[in-house]
Design a protein with these regions (language model features):
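Small-residue-biased structural context
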Residues: 1-228
């Protein structure tokens, strides 16, 4: 599968590229973080049920983003720096991006419980501002990764090394949320990306997702996005 980006990653002979799954994860972060400020802004005062629902969604995204960043920093940049003499300026920009994201996530973590407790509109408005800033900075960071880093993956990583990175990044996902993550990755996938991803899912898990998981994902996201 050839993943279309500003500067596409190099394809292997069978038409796939190692970084294709990371591109799908990036789509999840972009979409969900972009939508979250509007969803939070739409919560009326005292609607603690909606605040709690969106709070859980934010925490899941924040946990996923932190694990993704740790795997990216520990297993991606270092190896590329060793093997390709990764531009120190690019590496420093990526590190700055992570520090910026960590600061914003820390602010959100500190305020979220206050908002979930009583859905106070003043706290809500502050959250919206920070969530908007986070979404913008993360999207910019992911674009830089896709254009300046991922094109090097197929040339300098083995399948085993890339699998190790993927397992590290996905280490946060409990078994009962695997179907959610699969649904999230498939939501904006192209036909080629969908075939490539589903081809890596074990047959029993693929069948279970099609029988139960897909419907559960759609139902959950419809509830979450009800006010979008």
């Amino acid at each position: 599968m050839i993943v279309t980006m500003t500067h596409p990653t190099p394809s292997r002979e069978n038409g796939t590229c190692l970084a294709s799954d990371m591109v799908l994860v990036h789509k999840v972060f972009r979409r969900e973080l972009r939508m979250l400020p509007a969803l939070v802004a739409a919560v009326e005062p005292q609607r603690v049920d909606r605040a709690a629902l969106l709070g859980r969604h934010y925490r899941e995204l924040a946990t996923a983003l932190r694990h993704h960043h740790h795997a990216e920093r520990d297993l991606l940049w270092g190896r590329l720096a060793q093997r390709t003499q990764l531009d120190p300026g690019i590496e420093e920009r990526m590190r700055q991006g992570h520090r910026q994201h960590d600061d914003l996530l820390g602010e959100l973590d500190g305020m979220l419980d206050l908002w979930v407790a009583d859905a106070d509109p003043d706290v809500r408005d502050l959250l919206v501002d920070i969530l908007t800033e986070l979404a913008e900075h993360v999207a910019e960071h992911l674009t830089m990764i896709e254009t300046r880093v991922l094109p090097e993956v197929d040339r300098h990583f083995t399948q085993r090394e890339w699998l190790t990175l993927g397992l590290r990044a996905a280490g946060w996902i409990p078994l009962n949320r695997m179907a959610w993550m699969l649904g999230a990755m498939l939501e904006d996938a192209t036909d080629a990306e969908r075939r490539n991803l589903m081809g890596k899912v074990p047959a029993p898990a693929r069948l279970l997702y099609r029988m139960v998981g897909q419907e559960q994902y759609v139902r959950e996201m419809q509830e979450l996005r009800a006010a979008a």
